[in-house]
Amino acid sequence: MENFRKVRSEEAPAGDGDEGGSPNSGPFADLAPGAVHMRVKEGSKIRNLLAFATASMAQPATRAIVFSGCGRATTKTVTCAEILKRRLAGLHQVTRLRYRSVREVWQSLPPGPTPGQTPSDPAASLSVLKNVPSLAILLSKDALDPRQLGYQPPNLSPGPSSPPTVSTSKRSLGESAAEEGTAKRSQPEPEAENEDRTA
């Protein structure tokens, strides 16, 4: 493939209607009409996605949001959903994983100038059909059916960014041990007092 370059990549038409273009044909067919769909791409900026998602979920009319991405964008999709769950507590989650067919069109690179070749020779093209993983994450303010596959209830325990409820952090233990050490050092030792008196 070193003599080819990718011209375009497009989603292949689906035969079963599972991945068509309508908004309700995705993995969450029973979504409310006001749900926001965030399509995460490989080149998407996380801060831009989260700014829009946070502003959308702040509106009372928006009850659900779906993050979806395929191929190399799946990790970014998970990152966006996890950050939004940390920012907005109490979100119910359903995760769906599937495969999508993507058609890549490659075109041959023009070879170096050779004698006898005319510049008007058409370049050869190659079409490749690939199955890539696709991930869709639904986050909802409303309770979802806990029996469906991929369901995660809201996280009720404090997250890593929340302060601990009991002050047993390493820092507080270290400080108290250091304070005890300085308190012991500030008291004069009995042997030192005896030496001062004899002198």
Curated annotation (Swiss-Prot):
GO cellular component terms given for this protein: centriolar satellite; multimeric ribonuclease P complex; nucleolus; nucleoplasm; ribonuclease MRP complex
Pfam families cross-referenced by the UniProt entry: Alba (PF01918)
Composition bias type Basic and acidic residues, residue spans: 1-11
Region (Disordered): 1-31, 146-199
GO process terms (BP): rRNA processing; tRNA 5'-leader removal
InterPro entries to which the protein is assigned, alphabetical: Alba-like_dom_sf (IPR036882), Alba-like_NAB (IPR051958), DNA/RNA-bd_Alba-like (IPR002775)
SUPFAM superfamilies: AlbA-like
Subcellular location: Nucleus, Nucleolus
SS bond list: none
Phosphoserine sites (modified residues): S172
Bias kind Acidic residues: ranges: 190-199
GO molecular function, one term: ribonuclease P RNA binding
Keywords: Nucleus, Phosphoprotein, RNA-binding, rRNA processing, tRNA processing
Family label: Belongs to the histone-like Alba family.
Function in brief: Component of ribonuclease P, a ribonucleoprotein complex that generates mature tRNA molecules by cleaving their 5'-ends. Also a component of the MRP ribonuclease complex, which cleaves pre-rRNA sequences.
Subunit structure: Component of nuclear RNase P and RNase MRP ribonucleoproteins. RNase P consists of a catalytic RNA moiety and 10 different protein chains; POP1, POP4, POP5, POP7, RPP14, RPP21, RPP25, RPP30, RPP38 and RPP40. Within the RNase P complex, POP1, POP7 and RPP25 form the 'finger' subcomplex, POP5, RPP14, RPP40 and homodimeric RPP30 form the 'palm' subcomplex, and RPP21, POP4 and RPP38 form the 'wrist' subcomplex. All subunits of the RNase P complex interact with the catalytic RNA. Several subunits of RNase P are also part of the RNase MRP complex.
Name recorded for this polypeptide: Ribonuclease P protein subunit p25
Species of provenance: Mus musculus
Organismal lineage: Eukaryota, Metazoa, Chordata, Craniata, Vertebrata
